[in-house]
């Protein structure tokens, strides 16, 4: 079942190694679950079959044999139908995303959770997103987290026609190793800064005008909130100094967040 959902991720070099290792781990776990049940079910069937043979109910035995279905087969059929529907949807979306004058957004994700006995739970997550805009503009985001291996990584790519700048970050929470790599497609490393500026300028052409007014209003509201917090601080600093200072800090943090530009790359540290 997992292989059906993850086939598209396995074709991507960013995900392939982790997905292959995780799929093998899932197969071993499912095999350990199914084999004991399979032996028990076979032994029960044998005992029942011998009893029915002694009683002479051969027809009933044959009908039971024909209707005996693995408990996983029904789920497999359901997942196969779901996969076929998703593939058809992706094909239709692929035709739309090829329109050079259109906007499009696509997103795919998969997650597995397993827990055996007293062992800590194992969580595997992967997601990919693609945004497109006219003029050959594209942004890609990929992320993966594997609690079993401790690996967390993500990649953000900015594309203009056949040029691209991709930043990849990874961290292993078990070993503490961290790595940052940059990939330059059809350009040199020295051109990265100019390319990033060009990409940002192209994106600004498609920003809704109201977004800038909303941003200005947000700044004004935060400044007014900060001023009122300052007055409140003066009135209460003798009796409630710590809460007032914390209130002012929250206002300053909110104002600082408004100055963020572009598409930042973050790694969640635990």
Curated annotation (Swiss-Prot):
Region (Disordered) location: 127-148, 221-247
Domain of life according to the entry: Eukaryota
Cross-referenced Pfam families: Mlf1IP
PTM comment text: Phosphorylation is required for binding to YWHAZ.
Subcellular location: Cytoplasm; Nucleus; Cell projection, Cilium; Cytoplasm, Cytoskeleton, Cilium basal body
Keywords annotated in UniProt: Cell cycle, Cell projection, Cytoplasm, Cytoskeleton, Developmental protein, Differentiation, DNA-binding, Nucleus, Phosphoprotein
Region (Interaction with COPS3): 50-125
InterPro entries given in the database record: Myeloid_leukemia_factor (IPR019376)
Swiss-Prot/TrEMBL GO biological process terms: DNA-templated transcription; myeloid progenitor cell differentiation; regulation of cell cycle G1/S phase transition; regulation of DNA-templated transcription
GO terms, molecular function: DNA binding
Gene Ontology CC: ciliary basal body; cilium; cytoplasm; nucleus
Modified positions (Phosphoserine) in chain numbering: 6, 8, 32, 34
Residue stretches of biased makeup (Basic and acidic residues): 138-148
Sequence similarity: Belongs to the MLF family.
Assembly, per entry: Interacts with CENPU. Also interacts with NRBP1/MADM, YWHAZ/14-3-3-zeta and HNRPUL2/MANP. NRBP1 recruits a serine kinase which phosphorylates both itself and MLF1. Phosphorylated MLF1 then binds to YWHAZ and is retained in the cytoplasm. Retained in the nucleus by binding to HNRPUL2. Binds to COPS3/CSN3 which is required for suppression of COP1 and activation of p53.
Known role: Involved in lineage commitment of primary hemopoietic progenitors by restricting erythroid formation and enhancing myeloid formation. Interferes with erythropoietin-induced erythroid terminal differentiation by preventing cells from exiting the cell cycle through suppression of CDKN1B/p27Kip1 levels. Suppresses COP1 activity via CSN3 which activates p53 and induces cell cycle arrest. Binds DNA and affects the expression of a number of genes so may function as a transcription factor in the nucleus.
Protein name: Myeloid leukemia factor 1
Organism: Bos taurus (Bovine)
């Amino acid at each position: 079942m997992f292989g059906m959902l993850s086939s598209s991720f396995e074709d991507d070099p960013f995900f392939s190694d982790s997905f292959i290792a995780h799929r093998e781990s899932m197969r071993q776990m499912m095999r350990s679950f199914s084999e004991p049940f399979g032996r028990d079910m076979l032994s029960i069937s044998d005992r029942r079959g011998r009893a029915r043979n002694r009683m002479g109910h051969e027809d009933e035995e044959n009908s039971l044999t024909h209707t005996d279905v693995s408990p996983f087969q029904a789920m497999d059929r359901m997942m196969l139908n779901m996969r076929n529907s998703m593939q058809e949807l992706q094909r239709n979306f692929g035709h739309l995303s090829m329109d050079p004058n259109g906007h499009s957004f696509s997103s795919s994700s998969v997650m597995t959770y397993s827990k055996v006995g007293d062992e800590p739970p194992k969580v595997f997550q992967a997601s990919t997103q693609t945004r497109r805009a006219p003029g050959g503009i594209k942004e890609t985001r990929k992320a993966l987290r594997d609690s079993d291996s401790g690996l967390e990584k993500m990649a953000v790519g900015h594309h203009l026609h056949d040029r691209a700048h991709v930043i990849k970050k990874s961290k292993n929470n078990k070993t503490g190793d961290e790595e940052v790599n940059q990939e330059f497609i059809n350009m040199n490393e020295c051109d990265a800064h100019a390319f990033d500026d060009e990409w940002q300028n192209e994106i600004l052409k498609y920003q809704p005008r109201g977004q800038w007014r909303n941003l200005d209003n947000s700044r004004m509201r935060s400044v007014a909130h900060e001023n009122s917090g300052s007055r409140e601080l003066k009135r209460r600093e003798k009796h409630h100094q710590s809460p007032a200072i914390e209130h002012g800090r929250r206002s300053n943090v909110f104002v600082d967040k408004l100055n963020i530009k572009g598409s930042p790359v973050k790694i969640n540290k635990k």
